Design a protein with these regions (language model features):
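Short, Lys/Arg-enriched, Trp-marked, Pro/Gly-tolerant hinge/linker segments that flank
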Residues: 110-120, 135-146, 155-189, 193, ...
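Solvent-exposed, amphipathic alpha-helical segments
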Residues: 47, 123-137, 179-190, 234, ...
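A hydrophobic/aromatic-rich effector-binding and dimerization subdomain
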Residues: 2-22, 70-136, 154-166
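Basic/polar phosphate-binding segments, predominantly the helix-turn-helix DNA-binding elements
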Residues: 188, 194-232, 244, 250-279
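Generic protein-terminus/edge-of-domain signal
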Residues: 1-61, 65, 72, 78, ...
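Hydrophobic alpha-helical connector segments
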Residues: 150, 245-246
Length: 283
């Protein structure tokens, strides 16, 4: 949730737990479209978070929990401080215990009115709260309890929220993500520099025209729009965590068109950079 250099995020889970678990305290962040080879679970405890999963936009608030499937494009925006439980479970780890994982997606509708599903979701969130407690307190032998709770969570995820999908769809989606992965990695390494269309198309081993169509189809925006949104994520972070002048921050992250920056910033955050800083008492 908190902004860091992400496009295709590599989840390096600790060997003693095989998952990444933490209580996220986010002062404010914007993370553009990215994905990781892990199931991501976000359970809001304070504040709110704007989320986009593929083409669906929604806001989660205190008490809401969402499950984002692995290899699914998503973005998040936190415009005021929030606190959440964040759990990322690598697909490689899950596949050891769920052999048909590649044919499944997990449907966890936090807005459901179905009482049976609400009860199952409450049980799921209770395990997350127990994980948080044991992770914070860490008594002797805490890993025994922590890992047992992870397996209980996976059992519930598999039995209560898994839905089978067509194998052909998942196979093509994996091929597309494998092609997109080096592109987003390249952008994360060179986003401060001008990147030409021909340059980035070569990374994907595609002709420029086809690359444009492919990128827009998969990401929902053009390559240039994505590059500017990626820059914007770091600009927003620096804006709310430093006193550096706006023009210095823009130059640091390679955003050279100030007029375009102001328009994009206003569209994303509803205020000018000066207004955002005043709200956060940075000025």
């Amino acid at each position: 949730m908190k902004s860091k250099e992400i496009s295709h995020e590599i989840i390096n889970a600790p060997v003693d737990t095989n998952v990444k678990f933490r209580t996220s305290i986010d002062p404010g962040s914007y993370i553009p479209m990215h994905w990781h080879r892990a199931v991501e679970i976000i359970y809001m405890q304070e504040g709110s978070l704007d989320v986009t999963v593929e083409s669906e936009n929604f806001t989660i608030r205190k008490g809401d929990c969402i499950v984002i499937n692995g290899n699914v494009l998503h973005s998040t925006k936190c415009t005021s401080p929030n606190t959440a439980i964040l759990l990322q479970i690598p697909l490689d780890f899950m596949e050891k215990y769920i052999p048909d994982l590649g044919q499944l997606i997990f449907l966890f509708d936090f807005r459901t009115k179905d009482q049976r599903l609400q009860t199952k979701q409450t049980m799921f969130k209770t395990i997350l709260e127990q994980l948080q407690i044991i992770n914070d307190v860490r008594p002797d032998g805490y890993l025994l309890r922590f890992n047992s709770l992870i397996f209980e969570l996976l059992f519930q995820l598999y039995h209560n929220f898994a839905v089978k999908i067509l194998q052909n769809n998942t196979s093509q989606e994996k091929k597309d993500m494998d092609r997109l992965e080096p592109v987003l990695d390249y952008i994360s390494e060179h986003y401060r520099e001008p990147i030409s269309l021909n340059e980035i198309a070569k990374v994907a081993c595609l002709q420029a025209g086809y690359f444009c169509r492919f990128f827009r189809k998969k990401m929902g925006i053009t390559f240039l729009e994505y590059q500017n949104e990626y820059r914007l994520s770091f600009i927003y972070r620096d804006l709310i965590t430093t006193r550096d002048p706006v023009h210095v921050i823009l130059e640091r992250h390679g955003f050279t068109n100030y007029k375009l920056f102001r328009r994009m910033f206003l569209e994303h955050f509803g205020n000018t950079p000066t207004q955002i800083r005043k709200q956060r008492e940075i000025l």
